[in-house]
Curated annotation (Swiss-Prot):
The gene is groES. Belongs to the GroES chaperonin family. Keywords: Chaperone, Cytoplasm. This is Co-chaperonin GroES. Pfam families: Cpn10 (PF00166). GO terms for cellular component: cytoplasm. GO terms for molecular function: ATP binding; metal ion binding; protein folding chaperone; protein-folding chaperone binding; unfolded protein binding. InterPro entries: Chaperonin_GroES, Chaperonin_GroES_sf, Chaprnonin_Cpn10_CS, GroES-like_sf. It comes from Opitutus terrae (strain DSM 11246 / JCM 15787 / PB90-1). It is found in: Cytoplasm.
Length: 98
């Protein structure tokens, strides 16, 4: 796990964006911010898990190190040491990239 100074709580997951640059014919680079698609990210840290009505904690389906897809506008963005992270609920993770 990366040495990050943010510890998620509950069912939250800390992810770090994986920046992709797409170069099209003619040498124009299209940044991710101009693309309308889910964002690829790496799971950096996990909270304690989602607590059900019965008080039991449901384990996460993702693990630290997983590459995941998150909604472009989901979660809360955080900048720490010049790196961009997002805190999302596990339910906001669209899928795991295998």
């Amino acid at each position: 796990m990366a040495n990050v100074k943010i510890k998620p709580i509950g069912d939250r997951v800390l992810v770090q964006h994986i920046e992709e640059k797409e170069q099209v014919r003619g040498g124009i680079i299209i940044p991710d911010s101009a693309k309308e698609k889910p964002q690829e990210a790496k799971v950096i840290a996990l909270g304690t898990g989602k607590k059900g009505e019965d008080g039991k904690v449901t384990p996460f389906e993702v693990k630290v190190g997983d590459r995941v897809l998150i909604s472009k506008y989901g979660g809360t963005e955080v900048k720490l040491d010049e790196k961009k992270y997002t805190l999302v609920r596990e339910d906001d993770i669209l899928g795991v990239i295998e």
